Amino acid sequence: IYQSTPKIDKDAFLIAQVTDWEKLNLLEGEANVYFENTFIGKSIMNVAQQNDTLSFSLGRDKRIMIQRTKENEYTSRKFMGSNQTQSIAWKLSIRNTRPEPVTLTLYDQLPVSRNNNITVTAEEISGGSLDEAKGIITWQITLQPGEQRDLALRYKVKYPKGRNLIIE
């Protein structure tokens, strides 16, 4: 499975997930990692802290192209009474240039307010799943070879007039 958090890094990372790994008698420590008969690096195996599935990264895959761009036509600031509302919009574009289908877990986030005078409202998350307590949005998508998909992330932040917030 592939994972990406384009807000932090635009690359997709291939994640190996091994079930029934307890039967393999793996030792904790440094491991050489091979993928498709090619040495790709070293990883630390922390078997003491694993659950029923052992997960580790096999590195970046540049054949899954991801862009996260701000949509200026949806981004705005409005003043209403004693509050102001700022709308932010992002476009996530994902393209699979691999010769086979890929499954990708994509993560992004909304700001999370700890102040009752500041509210954050998701307006569009393109079918993603939102964890409101953490603000984390998760998309599970499958892309066919050559397929491109665009996802929208739009939210608004309402806060008292006169406050200066940095919202991204």
Q: Where on the chain are the PLM-derived regions?
A:
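Intrinsically disordered, low-complexity Ser/Thr/Pro/Gly-rich interaction regions
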Residues: I1-K91, R98-N116, E124-G127, P145-Y155, ...
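C-terminal intrinsically disordered extensions
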Residues: T119-S126, I136-W139
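A surface-exposed beta-strand-loop module
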Residues: I136-Q148
